[in-house]
Amino acid sequence: MSNALEWADSVKDEGVVREGFATSKSAMVHDADIAAVAAVALTSDGHDGQEYWLTGPEALTPPEKVRVLSEVLGRDVKFIELSQDEIVAQWREQGFGDDDVEFFLTMRTNPPEAGYTVLPTVQEVTGKPARTFKQWMGENAAAFGG
């Protein structure tokens, strides 16, 4: 979820999010949920040798995330979809090389099922439901000018 912080400046300054691949869903996980699962796994019996695949409780597209952002901030934030060429140019400007760009494109144009499949792992390991993107946004609204 913290990847959404990349939008903070444009949301504060212009009230917009510029992002590519508007139909690509992801089941982002809250960093606190990662920490909670790790804490249980490290301090409780029965976790030796276990692998845990973690997701958030919902798979959202970028426009859906922006709608949540607007709701939490109490103001309209506009979603502007970038073309594939525009997003690739942006990644290159940020210093990403060919291998990284190819990986990013694959993850967005043909993501693995694990990237958008909601799993119950956080609840199963911690006994608490995974935090939603709306909860994360509420905790981080100040970064977006809220």
What are these regions (language model features)?
Residues 85-146:
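A hydrophobic C-terminal alpha-helical subdomain
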